[in-house]
Amino acid sequence: VVGYFLLLLFGAKRPLGLFFLEHFGVKLVMNWYSAIFASIVVAFPLMYRTARGAFESFDETLAWSAQTLGQSNTWIFWRVRMPCCRQGILAGTVLAFARALGEYGATSMIAGYTPGRTATIATTVYQLWRTNDELGAMRWVLVDIVISAVVLLAVNLLEKKQKAGG
């Protein structure tokens, strides 16, 4: 559904697609950056909702305390609010990354499948499976799992380092 909506908005014969093509020489569909854009559109709500929850649960007395000490709103945001909400932002980012890594539908609709140009791991797995290359598909699934594991390990190590004060 999201991929179809993106095609309706940014297709080569649609007003936005034509505008970008005529004014900037940029084709917004069937290329590698349309795959990235589709993944972001699909994954962003997960990141936003999780980060928003972190900001909504922020203890405002911390900000008020900093204000009484004469700190600016910018200082309070970066030195008080962001550190307190860091875990929620990080959790949302990891959720969005995981969702984007496995994104197939919108990506295949707006970017297509051109090996070496617009193929993502998810679209490659599908194409290999469709052509009965289960070993090839499994290799890419393992690559996907390894990437996910490395990202989660890095996030966990970063969190441990932050908690230890390093």
Predicted regions and their residues:
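Membrane-interfacial helix termini and adjacent extracytoplasmic/periplasmic loops
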Residues: 2-40, 111-115
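Non-cytoplasmic
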Residues: 4-5, 11-12, 89-127
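Structural signal for membrane-spanning alpha-helices in multi-pass inner-membrane proteins
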Residues: 7, 46, 50, 152-159
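Alpha-helical membrane-protein architecture signal
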Residues: 29-33, 37-40, 44, 62, ...
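Transmembrane alpha-helices
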Residues: 48-51, 55, 59, 73-106
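Short hydrophobic faces within alpha-helices
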Residues: 61, 65-67, 137
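Interhelical loop and adjacent transmembrane-helix boundary motif
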Residues: 108-153, 158
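Short cytosolic juxtamembrane segments of multi-pass membrane proteins
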Residues: 158-166
